[in-house]
Amino acid sequence: MARPAYVAFLADVVASRARTPRARAMLQQRLRELARELNTRFRAHLAARAAITLGDELQALFTSPAPVWQAAHELRLRLPDVEWVVACGSGSLTTPLHRGASAPELDGPCYHAARAALDAAKADDRVFAFGGFDACVDGFARYYSALYGGWSAGQRLLANAQRARPDAKLKELARLVGVAPTSISHRRRRMVWHLVVLGDTMFQEVLTR
């Protein structure tokens, strides 16, 4: 019988070791708090709970790709001063999945695919990558990374807020981003946001099908 497929979720902080010891310690505390919040919010989708490993890397194991998009953008929204590389791998496990397990305790093809995708993303200066999925999923991730790389810091912040809170009204987005509502509208026009939404919708459809 075929082994069930899982999705290993790896989120690595860019250039974390360049921070001062004090700043890095504060970052690690924030990451631990974020992992706890993800465990609460995505409990129904977790095969193994999110935890911090390798100092500044967050790992989680999902039962399907369904929460990946939301989880990735929750990270970016909650820690806007942090640059993330997020990589996901689809596949089975080779270690036993026991009750209460944390993601870093486990191993298997899904983790190997995620690690290879993460390494490739870092080498190519990408921020989103996938392994073990249909090739078009990683193709969309490349489009995503290229678009993200061309935006200003303010545009990235707005994109992360809108992707993490797709139903938020203009005033709520303005609060999350820290600008006036009129600035939100201006940034959307500059980003041609309606086309970004179209691309994002297609990306999410191929990711979860």
Predicted regions and their residues:
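Regulatory and interdomain segments flanking nucleotide-handling catalytic cores
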Residues: 1-209
